[in-house]
């Protein structure tokens, strides 16, 4: 099972897009679309500080890393739930896990697995620390229970050399642009021309040369008196 397009867009909207490393609300060094060292490479500590010189390239890299990360979280959510999930439930659960990393220890998941869906939905709101995530938890709770996806804004935020988010848009993506970035599987190195396609002219084989030889011979013989 995979997160739907609507689920991915909602998750990206919750996380925000930051084209360089920054400290989140609890002091974890983060980059791109909520990417941390715990999720795997690249380590945000190794990325250049501040705004990149090529913003579009950084955005493409952010989406590449996000696609890499989301597979890990999808697999862990599938493993944590013992009962079937609808698409909206799965999308909400992956969003929760992407933010908290605690799908295996969350009480609401155990409650859901025991068969008490209503109580599980209520318990989602036990995860509201820091307070900044309260609105996100409410949106995930609504998505899980009612299948209503939140209205989204896909903002690329500015970031300072001191690794702080500057809440001024550097760019705003449309849903269509974001989905295209998610679908694009072409490595950046290919796009940037690091790998070029070389056209090789085939060497004529004897079979392909023979008609030319015969044609020339007939013309020669036909022209003799």
Predicted regions and their residues:
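Short runs of predominantly hydrophobic/aromatic residues within well-ordered alpha helices
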Residues: 28, 87-90, 117
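Short, conserved, surface-exposed binding loops centered on an aromatic residue
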Residues: 21-23, 84-85
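Substrate-binding/active-site groove segments that recognize
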Residues: 23-49
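Alpha-helical segment that forms one wall of the substrate-binding/catalytic cleft
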Residues: 45-82, 87-105, 109
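Long, amphipathic alpha-helical surface segments
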Residues: 1-9, 14-20, 26, 35-38, ...
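Structural recognition of the beta-strand scaffold that forms the well-ordered cores
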Residues: 30-32, 92-97, 120-123
